[in-house]
From Swiss-Prot:
Name of the featured protein: Cytochrome P450 4A11
Gene: CYP4A11
Organism this protein belongs to: Homo sapiens (Human)
Source organism phylogeny: Eukaryota, Metazoa, Chordata, Craniata, Vertebrata
Family annotation (InterPro entries): Cyt_P450 (IPR001128), Cyt_P450_CS (IPR017972), Cyt_P450_E_grp-I (IPR002401), Cyt_P450_sf (IPR036396), Cytochrome_P450_Monoox (IPR050196)
Residues recorded as bearing Phosphoserine in the entry: S440
Keyword terms, alphabetized: Endoplasmic reticulum, Fatty acid metabolism, Heme, Iron, Lipid metabolism, Membrane, Metal-binding, Microsome, Monooxygenase, NADP, Oxidoreductase, Phosphoprotein
Cofactors demanded by this protein: heme
Membrane-protein topology: Peripheral membrane protein
Residues where heme binds: E321, C457
Gene3D superfamilies to which the protein is assigned, alphabetical: Cytochrome P450
Function: A cytochrome P450 monooxygenase involved in the metabolism of fatty acids and their oxygenated derivatives (oxylipins). Mechanistically, uses molecular oxygen inserting one oxygen atom into a substrate, and reducing the second into a water molecule, with two electrons provided by NADPH via cytochrome P450 reductase (CPR; NADPH-ferrihemoprotein reductase).
C-alpha cells in the first residue's frame, strides 16, 4: 500500500488558498458592515433633518470637539445656537439628541422610556441592576419596595446624624487652617457624605471620616467615575471582552472589587445583627428601621425576598448615588457662596438668627431658612450634580413645536444645558438667588437637579436636607473665600466635577459663645 506525502509546495498552496478565502470573507463582512452603517446613517440623517446641528466628521462625529473636557462649554454654545434640541454625533454613525428645552423635557419625563442601554450598561459591573439601571415592571416593584425608606418619619432623625458628620469635617478643616493654604474641599465633602450615608442608611457606628480604610473606597468611586465616562467615549472599548483586556478594563475590575468589598461587608454585618435581634416587631420597638433594614426585610409582590445579587445592586446604587452626587452639590454650593460674599453673609445672618451657634439643628429648622434655600437652588441650577440623563425612545415622539423623533433614538436630557439656556433663564451665568424667590414664576420642568417624572431621584428629600445642614453649619463656622489662582473648571462626568478641584480659603469665625465668655 502506497502512502502519499504532501509536498511542501502543495501544502503552502493549500494554506495560501485558505488565507485568501479567509481574507475575502473578512473583506466581504467589512463591506456588509460598512453598507449597514451607511444605510443606518442615512436613515438617521433623514429622521433628524428637522434638527440642525454643527458640522460633524463622517466617522468620528462630534467626539473630537468634546474630547478635551470641553463638553459643557460646547453644549452652552449649542444651546444658544440651536433651539430646544441638537443632535450630537458619536463615532461610527451613532447619535444622541441633546434636549435642553423645558417643554421637551416634560414630554420625555412624562413617558416610560427605558434608560439608554448603550451607555448605562457600562455602570452594571459596578452598581449592578438596581433602581438606577432597572426598567419596566422590575423597576416599578423595586421603587415601590424602597419608597418607605424615604418616608418623613424615617428622614427626621437623620438630620442630627447629618450634623454630626458635618461637624467632624469642619473640625478637620479647623486643624488644617494653620497650614495657611487653600483647601481642596471635594475630597473632604465626599468623605463626609459617605459618612452620612453609612450612619443614616446603614446605622454605622462611629465616623469613617477618621478611618483611613475608607479612603480606598472613595478613590475607587472616583476612579470608576472617570473610567466609565471615558469608556462611553472610546470606540474601541465598547466590547466587554476587548475592554477586559485593556489596562483601563483591568483598572475598572480592581476598582469594582474594592467597591464591592465595602458594600458586602456592610450587608454581612447587618444580616448578622438582624439574626441576633430576632423578629421584626421586636426590632421596631428597639430602633428605627433604616434603608438596609427595609431592603433585607422587604418582600416582592410574589412574596420572595431580594436575592443577594439584587441586594448588593441596590446597596451599591444608593451608596454611589447617595454620597457622590450630594458631595458634588455641596462642594459647588460652597464655591458659589465663596464667590458671592454678599449672598454668603445674608445666608449666614439668616442661619445665625435661626440656629444661634449651631449646637442644635433639627428637621423643623430646615424649612425656616428661605434665603439660604434660594441660594442652594441657584447653585444647583448653575452646577447641577448630574449633568444629563439618557433615554431610549420606545415609541415615536412628537414635541409641542411639531418636530418629532422616531422609535429607537437615544435622547440625552441635558440638565446642564437646560439650566444654562438663556431662553429659560435670562443671563444664565449670573448667580441670582431671587430666581427662586417665593412666588417667582417658573416652568415646571425648568429646574431639574433631581430629574423629574416617575423616575425622579427617590432620595431627593434626603439630599436636600443634607445640602441645607452642610451649608448652614459650614457658614456658621467659616467665612468662605475663593482661591483666585485656581478657578474650578466644571467637567461632565457621571456627576459634575471640577477638572482642577474646588479650592477654597477658609477664615475661622468667632464663636458667639466664646465672645460672651470673654466679656
Amino acid at each position: 500500500m502506497s502512502v502519499s506525502v504532501l509536498s511542501p509546495s502543495r501544502l503552502l498552496g493549500d494554506v495560501s488558498g485558505i488565507l485568501q478565502a479567509a481574507s475575502l470573507l473578512i473583506l466581504l463582512l467589512l463591506l456588509i458592515k460598512a453598507v449597514q452603517l451607511y444605510l443606518h446613517r442615512q436613515w438617521l440623517l433623514k429622521a433628524l433633518q428637522q434638527f440642525p446641528c454643527p458640522p460633524s466628521h463622517w466617522l468620528f462625529g462630534h467626539i473630537q470637539e468634546l474630547q478635551q473636557d470641553q463638553e459643557l462649554q460646547r453644549i452652552q454654545k449649542w444651546v444658544e445656537t440651536f433651539p430646544s434640541a441638537c443632535p450630537h454625533w458619536l463615532w461610527g454613525g451613532k447619535v444622541r439628541v441633546q434636549l435642553y428645552d423645558p417643554d421637551y423635557m416634560k414630554v420625555i419625563l412624562g413617558r416610560s422610556d427605558p434608560k439608554s442601554h448603550g451607555s448605562y450598561r457600562f455602570l452594571a459591573p459596578w452598581i449592578g441592576y438596581g433602581l438606577l439601571l432597572l426598567n419596566g415592571q422590575t423597576w416599578f416593584q423595586h421603587r415601590r419596595m424602597l419608597t418607605p425608606a424615604f418616608h418623613y418619619d424615617i428622614l427626621k432623625p437623620y438630620v442630627g446624624l447629618m450634623a454630626d458628620s458635618v461637624r467632624v469635617m469642619l473640625d478637620k478643616w479647623e486643624e488644617l487652617l494653620g497650614q495657611d493654604s487653600p483647601l481642596e474641599v471635594f475630597q473632604h465633602v465626599s468623605l463626609m457624605t459617605l459618612d452620612t450615608i453609612m450612619k443614616c442608611a446603614f446605622s454605622h457606628q462611629g465616623s469613617i471620616q477618621v478611618d483611613r480604610n475608607s479612603q480606598s473606597y472613595i478613590q475607587a468611586i472616583s476612579d470608576l467615575n472617570n473610567l466609565v465616562f471615558s469608556r462611553v467615549r472610546n470606540a474601541f472599548h465598547q466590547n466587554d471582552t476587548i475592554y477586559s483586556l485593556t489596562s483601563a478594563g483591568r483598572w475598572t475590575h480592581r476598582a469594582c472589587q474594592l467597591a464591592h468589598q465595602h458594600t458586602d461587608q456592610v450587608i454581612q454585618l447587618r444580616k448578622a445583627q438582624l439574626q441576633k435581634e430576632g423578629e421584626l416587631e421586636k426590632i421596631k420597638r428597639k430602633r428605627h428601621l433604616d434603608f438596609l433594614d427595609i431592603l433585607l426585610l422587604a418582600k416582592m409582590e410574589n412574596g420572595s425576598i431580594l436575592s443577594d445579587k439584587d441586594l448588593r445592586a441596590e446597596v451599591d446604587t444608593f451608596m454611589f448615588e447617595g454620597h457622590d452626587t450630594t458631595a458634588s452639590g455641596i462642594s459647588w454650593i460652597l464655591y458659589a457662596l465663596a464667590t458671592h460674599p454678599k449672598h454668603q453673609e445674608r445666608c449666614r445672618e439668616e442661619i445665625h438668627s435661626l440656629l444661634g451657634d449651631g449646637a442644635s439643628i433639627t428637621w423643623n429648622h430646615l424649612d425656616q431658612m428661605p434665603y439660604t434655600t434660594m441660594c442652594i437652588k441657584e447653585a444647583l441650577r448653575l452646577y447641577p450634580p448630574v449633568p444629563g440623563i439618557g433615554r431610549e425612545l420606545s415609541t415615536p415622539v412628537t414635541f409641542p413645536d411639531g418636530r418629532s423623533l422616531p422609535k429607537g433614538i437615544m435622547v440625552l436630557l441635558s440638565i446642564y444645558g437646560l439650566h444654562h439656556n438663556p431662553k429659560v433663564w435670562p443671563n444664565p451665568e449670573v448667580f441670582d438667588p431671587f430666581r427662586f424667590a417665593p412666588g417667582s414664576a417658573q416652568h415646571s420642568h425648568a429646574f431639574l437637579p433631581f430629574s423629574g417624572g416617575s423616575r425622579n431621584c427617590i432620595g431627593k428629600q434626603f439630599a436636600m436636607n443634607e445640602l441645607k445642614v452642610a451649608t448652614a453649619l459650614t457658614l456658621l463656622r467659616f467665612e468662605l473665600l475663593p482661591d483666585p489662582t485656581r478657578i474650578p473648571i466644571p467637567i461632565a462626568r457621571l456627576v459634575l466635577k471640577s477638572k482642577n478641584g474646588i479650592h477654597l480659603r477658609l477664615r475661622r469665625l468667632p464663636n458667639p459663645c466664646e465672645d460672651k465668655d470673654q466679656l
